[in-house]
Swiss-Prot record:
This is Large ribosomal subunit protein bL20. It comes from Nocardioides sp. (strain ATCC BAA-499 / JS614). One of its GO terms (molecular function) is structural constituent of ribosome. It comes from the Bacteria. InterPro entries: Ribosomal_bL20, RIBOSOMAL_L20_CS, Ribosomal_protein_bL20_C. Disulfide bonds: none annotated. Belongs to the bacterial ribosomal protein bL20 family. The gene is rplT. GO terms for cellular component: ribonucleoprotein complex; ribosome. The keyword Acyltransferase does not apply. Keywords: Ribonucleoprotein, Ribosomal protein, RNA-binding, rRNA-binding. Binds directly to 23S ribosomal RNA and is necessary for the in vitro assembly process of the 50S ribosomal subunit. It is not involved in the protein synthesizing functions of that subunit. GO terms for biological process: ribosomal large subunit assembly; translation. SUPFAM superfamilies: Ribosomal protein L20 (SSF74731). NCBIfam families: rplT_bact.
């Protein structure tokens, strides 16, 4: 059986890892074993953070919608409830964009949501005169 010499493949593998680790501090950019460990962790972090990013954007959209809805005298919760009752199917990304860039369209949606909501059940009731 022929002898296998790994010099070329091993050097290429190490070079790729060290190139990915360029820019890291200290030994993590110069020593193969440290660099390999850090590159592996970095790939895991980037994978996880790509998923976290979606939740972060949703939080941002909700904050923007809430601020714009409160400016119109309505909370985020009641606004979304009113839109659902009115049958308006606009996602939070578009609502946040409207709140920032097209205030008149957003205000029209607020009025639609207000009209669709039932009377406030927690409001004090008028006393019936007996």
């Amino acid at each position: 059986m022929a002898r296998v010499k790994r010099a070329v493949n091993a050097q290429k593998k190490r070079r790729v890892v060290l190139e990915r680790a360029s820019g890291y501090r200290g030994q993590r950019s110069r020593l193969y074993r440290k660099a390999k460990e850090q590159v592996t962790h970095s790939l895991v972090y980037s994978y996880n953070d790509r998923r976290k990013n979606k939740g972060n954007f949703r939080k941002l959209w909700i904050q923007r919608i809430n601020a714009a809805a409160r400016a119109q005298g309505m909370t985020y919760n009641r606004f979304i409830q009113g839109l659902n009752l009115a049958g308006v199917e606009v996602d939070r990304k578009i609502l946040a964009d409207l709140a920032v860039n097209d205030v008149t369209a957003f205000n029209a949606l607020v009025e639609t949501a207000k009209a669709a909501l039932p009377a406030d059940v927690n409001a004090p009731k008028a006393e019936a005169s007996a």
